[in-house]
């Protein structure tokens, strides 16, 4: 645990913000003063799921071309914030659109812990959240966070780490969320780091990126995109749990085993989100041409609702893989899978990967394939296997191991990983 002079109570936002403003540059001051919530925007008909969030999330003027620039910020509500943070801030910053490479705005949040920052500033962690849906109203900085994630992030804040948490491209902000694609996920994380470090929040230059599920993919992606996209950042470690691996052989990473295709499984709802991404990759693709009549109502929910609502609808309508489609989506979803692949597995950043042995959302076999392939690529992987934990359980269940890993990463200790011992583990 990082030593802190922790205050006995959570300070009011105004008191802490005043201290922050004294330290901050004129650019940050302008950003803080110009941020405003306004009233929720009307839902856009052009992009399903757009709108329903305050005007803060839409930048009305021309976007600066420089990625990682803080555009504005404002306090989060108590429901959107974290109890172990002295400062809970919503942010809007510039990033790069994952497919066109044009400038976009991306939203997120910054959480500053209680107490006095250590010399060199608060050690910074960049959180990449798991799947929440594709509608703007699902953005964690607006909708809040699950109990699992709240517990997890509060644990890190209590240990003295500041956290920047991107919403990702198209969540909260205008445009379609490119669910699962690796480059926009990585860009959103990397530019969130740039934005808060440049804004003088008294943050360290060293950063650890951590994420779960879709966020595990994002965290791993930052490790491989960092060298070309944000070489100036000092990322000293990556922590990923429940990490999907689009390059795993066959269709196991998408569909599960053939025996599951007639089972009503909530995790199959992720396929509906992938269909929206398919439309982004190929504008001529019409998802409803592939869906059965039985599955179309659930698809409509996936366009405007968040993950738990999609899963509930999927189960309530008795949907399986086999009864959801009238035309096979495999070629389309394979294309999404290819577009989701990492450009390389090679990274010089130490990587912690935690796998729950009962994970059926990101299949254990595909996670092990990622670990083995990353090791073969020369990565310094520290893999931890938790036989009794499922996809969600691996998040907090890995804390005893991941906290030690992060402490070592920030200390500058060389971490060789445990690739040599991984061959003894066989996938189930």
Where are these predicted regions, by residue range?
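Accessory cap/linker subdomain of secreted extracellular hydrolases
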Residues: 57-61, 244-344
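Short beta-strand/loop motif that positions the catalytic acidic residue
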Residues: 352-355, 359
């Amino acid at each position: 645990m990082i030593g802190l002079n922790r205050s006995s109570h959570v300070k009011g936002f105004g008191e802490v913000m005043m201290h922050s403003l004294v330290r901050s540059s004129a650019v940050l001051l302008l950003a803080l003063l110009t941020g405003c919530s306004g009233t929720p925007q009307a839902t856009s008909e052009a992009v399903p799921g757009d709108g329903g969030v305050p005007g803060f999330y839409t930048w009305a003027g021309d976007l600066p071309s420089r990625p990682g620039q803080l555009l504005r910020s404002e306090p989060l509500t108590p429901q959107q914030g974290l109890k172990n943070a002295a400062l809970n801030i919503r942010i809007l910053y510039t990033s790069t659109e994952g497919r066109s490479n044009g400038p976009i705005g991306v939203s997120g949040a910054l959480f500053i812990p209680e107490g006095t920052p250590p010399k060199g500033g608060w050690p910074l962690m960049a959180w990449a959240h798991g799947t929440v849906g594709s509608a703007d109203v699902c953005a964690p900085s607006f909708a809040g966070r699950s109990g699992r994630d709240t517990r997890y992030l509060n644990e890190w804040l209590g240990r003295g780490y500041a956290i920047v948490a991107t919403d990702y491209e198209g969540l909260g902000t205008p445009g379609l969320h490119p669910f699962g694609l690796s480059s926009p996920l990585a860009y959103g994380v990397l530019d969130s780091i740039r934005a808060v470090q440049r804004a003088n929040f008294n943050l360290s230059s060293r950063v650890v990126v951590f994420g779960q599920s879709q966020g595990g993919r994002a965290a791993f992606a930052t490790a491989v995109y960092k060298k070309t996209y944000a070489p100036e950042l000092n990322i000293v470690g990556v922590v990923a749990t429940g990490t999907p691996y689009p390059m795993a052989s066959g269709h196991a990473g998408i569909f599960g085993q053939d025996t599951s295709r007639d089972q009503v499984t909530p995790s199959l709802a992720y396929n509906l989100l992938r269909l929206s991404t398919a439309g982004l990759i190929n504008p001529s693709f019409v998802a409803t041409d592939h869906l059965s009549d039985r599955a179309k109502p659930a698809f409509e929910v996936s366009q405007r609702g968040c993950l738990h609502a999609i899963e509930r609808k999927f189960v309530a309508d008795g949907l399986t893989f086999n009864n959801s489609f009238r035309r096979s989506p495999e070629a389309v979803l394979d294309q999404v899978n290819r577009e989701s692949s990492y450009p390389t597995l090679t990274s010089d950043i130490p990587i912690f990967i935690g796998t729950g042995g009962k994970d059926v959302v990101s299949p254990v076999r595909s996670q092990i394939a990622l670990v083995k392939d990353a090791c073969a690529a020369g990565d310094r992987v520290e893999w931890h296997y938790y036989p009794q934990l499922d996809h969600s359980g691996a998040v907090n269940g890995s804390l005893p191991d991941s906290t030690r890993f992060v402490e070592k990463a920030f200390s500058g200790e060389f971490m060789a990983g445990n690739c040599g011992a991984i061959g003894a583990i066989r996938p189930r």
